[in-house]
From Swiss-Prot:
Residues 38-501 form the Topo IIA-type catalytic domain. It is a peripheral membrane protein. One of its GO terms (cellular component) is DNA topoisomerase IV complex. It is found in: Cell membrane. SMART domains: TOP4c. The keyword tRNA-binding does not apply. This is DNA topoisomerase 4 subunit A. HAMAP family: ParC_type1. Heterotetramer composed of ParC and ParE. The gene is parC. Topoisomerase IV is essential for chromosome segregation. It relaxes supercoiled DNA. Performs the decatenation events required during the replication of a circular DNA molecule. InterPro entries: GyrA/parC_rep, Gyrase/topoIV_suA_C, Topo_IIA-like_dom_sf, Topo_IIA_A/C_ab, Topo_IIA_A_a_sf, Topo_IIA_dom_A, TopoIV_A_Gneg, Type_II_DNA_Topoisomerases.
Amino acid sequence: MSESLDLSLEGVERRSLAEFTEQAYLNYSMYVIMDRALPHIGDGLKPVQRRIVYAMSELGLDADSKHKKSARTVGDVLGKFHPHGDSACYEAMVLMAQPFSYRYPLVDGQGNWGAPDDPKSFAAMRYTEARLSRYSEVLLSELGQGTVDWVPNFDGTLDEPAVLPARLPNLLLNGTTGIAVGMATDVPPHNLREVASACVRLLDQPGATVAELCEHVPGPDFPTEAEIITPRADLQKVYETGRGSVRMRAVYRVEDGDIVIHALPHQVSGSKVLEQIAGQMQAKKLPMVADLRDESDHENPTRIVIIPRSNRVDVEELMTHLFATTDLETSYRVNLNIIGLDGKPQVKDLRQLLSEWLQFRIGTVRRRLQFRLDKVERRLHLLDGLLIAFLNLDEVIHIIRTEDQPKAVLMERFELSEVQADYILDTRLRQLARLEEMKIRGEQEELLKEQKRLQTLLGSEAKLKKLVREELIKDAETYGDDRRSPIVARAEARALSETELMPTEPVTVVLSEKGWVRCAKGHDIDAAGLSYKAGDGFKAAAPGRSNQYAVFIDSTGRSYSLPAHSLPSARGQGEPLSGRLTPPPGASFECVLLPDDDALFVIASDAGYGFVVKGEDLQAKNKAGKALLSLPNGSAVVAPRPVRDVEQDWLAAVTTEGRLLLFKVSDLPQLGKGKGNKIIGIPGERVASREEYLTDLAVLPAGATLVLQAGKRTLSLKGDDLEHYKGERGRRGNKLPRGFQRVDSLLVDIPPQD
């Protein structure tokens, strides 16, 4: 027989899983945001950093003390204030000690605290020693003066400061990074003098705009001599919005032809940069670099030497390529997301940030002055009682010695307060007997003057701000230094293309009748004398440079291009173009050339139509090429002819009927593709039936001689001889003399220049 179990839910809180999960996640998020990842605007520190600095001050590890083992500090921090992992705590401490990580280090370390090349190469905490740096006084000097609120530590046995009373806006000076839940912060470091100057400007001119503050704070200042190349207008926009990015670039100089990089961007590893450059060299993407060395040492923390292959290498172009392809140029995110005085995280612009910090600073100074005033007034009150005791010394001593309750009698007899009576009773009789009226009255006068000064300061907002201003200027003189990261206007870095990276050697590209291609070094190549496969032979050749594109034009008028350096060597018989390009079925490759992008060519069909085209328009990006020349029915492509001067050059066209026509090249249109305009008049039906068509074209510079070849016979035409054949573009042309009715080709003889 089963018994029913009655479950009692008395004293048990019932909540839905959704509600509980939501609340738990929210609590965790708030903890990470408020107590771990984001800094406070007052001192610019995260809780772990604040606890390390405070614990070190409590251990007496100020800038004038001896260094103590880091493990001692970490143990104190964990045991008293920060119950988390020791490695994370020590790493936070290391970061504050590294002069290449912090613009103004808070910890002065002794031992191995890491290197710029490898910041995490620091020794274990049992080996290193530390004390606070001189700059930490900015955060700690006013701590015991009633300036900040105190909160219980994690177990309630000790108190710790909720925020440190920073005399300077440390948040901007050292910057910070942090990733919370749903938000992050990235505050770059700044120059102390510049930020202090902006604070003074804001005190003098509360309505100052961000643009006006940027006159004092032009940009971040990292702990490296690398250049900030972000334009000033963009930097101002970052400060106006609280978001953006800052770009840094390495600094180099040329020594005896070698490139020496002597400053790297913030947190960039020299060894990683070396790996990146070496990787490009191994991949043969840096043919202009002969060698690479790392000469960094203790005297020169950064010295990377790049040795160019020759003195003809453009150093600026090479470095621009390296800036674009390696960490020699790096971008840093800026996100001024911080916990304000209201305890809420918010992205602030520069003016909001400085205004709120000044509000914090003025409040801190007011609390410091009030604390001192209270102390002065307490002392004056005690001195009043002490003076009464001195003036009635014998009676006071008699009361103390004879009365059972001397405190009550003293208070009643001399109208003393309880505090005054306690102070007199706590003073030894021997000291009471030694009291001097002049000393008491002298101390009273000094304290009364100080009381008046403090009351004046606390009673006037203007005088309080003036005091804050004076202290800012003094601290800037004491702890400030010159800017380390210059802000320089530089052109945007551009990576060199594969073609630009190739060495510019003279080459000749050879095309065979069957469409095989190869590339020979040099221009003095007997292309027709090269060995060809059985049944194949020489078709065309074009001289150029190895960093150019070879352009191929097929029998359908389509153009294709391939990098010349990628073509097979002429030591063999090459490879078929059809393996790398996809021409239409039945098409054959007719000609090849290596054009410069801005060079001009006349391209035509043997139907007598053509146009002028730029070299860059001959190139095609895809394997299928591009439609370049539209061919009328039955016509073929005539190889392009280079043009030197469009305005001065003449175009000569000859047909199979022995007709020759000359006209100015400028009469032809410049197109990117198409059929073009009529060059010489040939009836369309005669072209289609191949009864008559264009035999050849030639471009004649001024003063050149036109040489006609008909079999073994040649005819040279120059000067007045050519006038007979000049006419309007598109005419039929004039008949050539007997024996030259069938011209094979046109050649141009250019006289030598004086």
